[in-house]
Regions:
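Short, acidic/polar
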Residues: 253-260
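Contiguous mid-protein beta-loop-alpha structural module that forms a pocket-lining wall or clamp
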Residues: 250, 264-267
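Conserved, mostly hydrophobic/aromatic
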Residues: 96, 116, 133, 173, ...
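Short, well-ordered junction/capping motifs at the entry into regular secondary structure
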Residues: 1-2
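Short flexible coil/turn linkers enriched for glycine and charged/polar residues
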Residues: 79-82, 92-94, 195, 205, ...
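Conserved SAM/AdoMet-binding glycine-rich loop
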Residues: 14, 23, 125-252
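Proteins enriched for Cys/Gly/acidic motifs involved in redox and nucleic-acid/cofactor modification
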Residues: 6-141, 154, 184, 199, ...
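Terminal RNA-binding accessory module
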Residues: 285-348
Length: 348
């Protein structure tokens, strides 16, 4: 990432951070010795200070192995002058075999509601109109804060509190885990005008065999029940998803089951990924089950073509309708050309 060390500076510094840096700091330095700052997942709020130090002292690598202070790990990220991402939770208690997050970020830690509310109020004061709540599994937010009341859907309560903040006009959240998606959350999305009618629900695969190998904690039937529930509660909802193509052991029948879910659910958008073994994950050890690259590429293209057809069909429902657009960018070449998103997250 290119980052200015200060607002007044015209000099950009190079910074690498996140899960990969947390796990493989030596490898990052070996491959990119010219990077000014390498940080992990536990001290992202220190990046500006470290960049300033690097300007005086040269390249810095600072990896903190563990922290119990979530406030040192997060900072609001502005997508534009009117939109910001707000982290409500770090870490993950799940054990998906393709994911490195639990081993490098640790267990789930929820921010205190008061800290979240105060940050969003500050953002609203600065002119931010839209906030996106971030967490590895937002639906489990607050479980660690409510030890004696684990059944309470605290994420839903948080949505109601944020909805009452003056100045904030649109609220989004990502990512929920299908197995933890509660009906109370859907009711909140339906009841609260500021909460966008957009739901991201990661599928990863439509095959029960592959879902089990991934340790996802749900099967195809349960996932589709969640999709049906979402559509029943939220009129004109826009649903997006994640799919991994070519997970170890995936055969043609497994892939076809994924396509069956795609055809049934009719997602507005899919974030598609070709499986690649990530060192340190369980799935990276499934070497004898790896799918050939040519097969992955062919399946990926079939999925892409089909989803393009579905997306075009879904987008046509907006023709001749009035939509509220939050303008995020003005063209540098023509001030009359604006870019923004409607409530469902579609770019116009």
């Amino acid at each position: 990432t290119l980052v200015k060390s200060s607002a007044a500076s015209d000099v950009y510094k190079r910074q690498v951070g996140g899960c990969a840096a947390q796990k493989d700091k030596e490898l990052v330095r070996e491959r990119a010795p010219w990077v000014d700052v390498v940080i992990g997942t536990h001290n992202t709020t220190d990046v500006i200070n470290l960049l300033n130090q690097a300007e005086d002292w040269g390249p810095i690598t600072e990896i903190i192995e563990e922290t119990t202070d979530i406030e040192t790990e997060i900072a609001a990220v502005r997508e534009s002058s009117v939109s910001a991402f707000v982290t409500i939770q770090i870490g993950c208690n799940n054990s998906c075999t393709f994911c490195i997050v639990p081993s490098v970020r640790g267990i789930e830690i929820s921010r205190r509601p008061s800290d979240i509310i105060n940050e969003i109020k500050s953002l609203a004061h600065d002119g931010v109109k839209e906030i996106t709540l971030l967490g590895q599994n937002v639906n489990s937010y607050g479980r660690d804060l409510m030890i004696n009341n684990r059944r309470k859907p605290y994420f839903t309560e948080l949505l109601y509190k944020i909805h009452d903040i003056d100045g904030i006009e649109r609220i989004r959240f990502t990512s929920p885990h299908p197995k933890d998606f509660k009906i109370e959350t859907l009711k909140a999305v339906a009841d609260l005008p500021k909460v966008a009618n957009q739901i991201h629900i990661p599928l990863q695969s439509g095959s029960n065999k592959i879902l089990s190998s991934m340790h996802r904690g749900y099967n195809q039937k349960r996932f589709l029940e969640k999709v049906d529930l979402i559509k029943s509660f939220i009129p004109n909802v826009s649903i997006s998803s994640d799919i991994i193509v070519g997970f170890p052991g995936e055969n043609e029948d497994d892939f076809q089951q994924t396509m069956d879910v795609v055809n049934y659910a009719e997602f507005d958008l899919i974030y598609m990924f070709k499986f690649s073994p990530r060192p340190g994950t369980v799935a990276s050890d499934y070497v004898d089950q790896f799918v050939e690259k040519e097969v992955i590429d062919e399946r990926f293209m079939r999925l892409k073509v089909r989803q393009t057809e579905i997306s075009e069909k879904r987008y046509k429902r907006f023709v001749n309708t009035d939509q509220t657009i939050l303008v995020e960018k003005v063209s540098k070449k023509d001030n009359n050309i604006l870019t923004g998103r409607i409530e469902g997250g579609h770019i116009v």
